[in-house]
Amino acid sequence: MQIVLISGLSGSGKSIALHVLEDAGYYVVDNLPSALLLQLVLHLRGAGYQRVAVAVDMRSGSSIAALPEQVESLRGMVDDLRFIFLEARDDTLIARFSETRRRHPLADENVSLDEAIQRERDALASVAELGHRMDTSDIHANTLRAWIKDFIGAAASEGLTLMFQSFGFKYGIPLDADLVFDVRCLPNPYYDPLLRPLTGRDQGVIDYLEKVPEVGRMAEDIRRFVADWLPAYMRDNRSYLTVAIGCTGGQHRSVYMAEWLARRFADRVRVIVRHRSAARRVQDAPPAVSGK
């Protein structure tokens, strides 16, 4: 039996994740009081369900504090347990609530939206450490859907999934990064007018960067560091390791580096590549990721 648990901050996109899992054939349970988690799993296992997705969050009230202990108990009950924790920056969450005109579950006439978000973040801090964290700040709903589909694919495979994620420092460091490397010291193709509209996946940018010796040296240093420590992360029984590569705008250098590294590890572990900021060159500001 495979269980996928979904938790996270209100407004981070949990309902989108559940819809993707439901479309993929999972039996979905939303807004389950965390105190009923073990009882639900026992019932569904007895009924013959093989793939189940359950959302547990602050709507469970104070019982959410017991979730870490329940998750540990659950690990001994099922063959495969995966946990996704969705989060986003405060400014992103505020913008989403403003756009959708929904009320935060912890907000009322005496508690502002800012304060409600902080209270929820504090209350879920221990829950966030239980599984794979996804930072949905500044992304489209379709991008989140693709991420969840990647996660489902990783859940179907054994062992660790290594994720290389490019980003732009001017948009903030991804909240879900395990390792962060800064490549802003490398020459920037942005200042070449012909390369400015391209990304690090385009051949012109690749040729530009591969002519610079420092680029190759830094790429090899990062590769060696990840390779040296990857066995330790694998021994820790992690499902995901997210390596974030950042440049100024997340369009050229970091994209190139993430792609380069992904190719070097593709024959060792399952590899996923995400580019958080590169799409900004052709997209307007993304719409809110609606959902809980």
From Swiss-Prot:
Q: Which organism is it from?
A: Azoarcus sp. (strain BH72)
Q: Does the keyword Hydrolase apply?
A: no
Give the classification, highest ranks: Bacteria, Pseudomonadati, Pseudomonadota, Betaproteobacteria, Rhodocyclales
Protein biosynthesis among keywords = no
Query: Which residues of this UniProt protein bind GTP?
Result: 57-60
Query: Which residues hold ATP?
Result: 8-15
Family, as annotated: Belongs to the RapZ-like family.
Q: What protein am I looking at?
A: Nucleotide-binding protein azo0399
Q: What Pfam families does the entry give?
A: PapZ_C, RapZ-like_N
Role summary: Displays ATPase and GTPase activities.
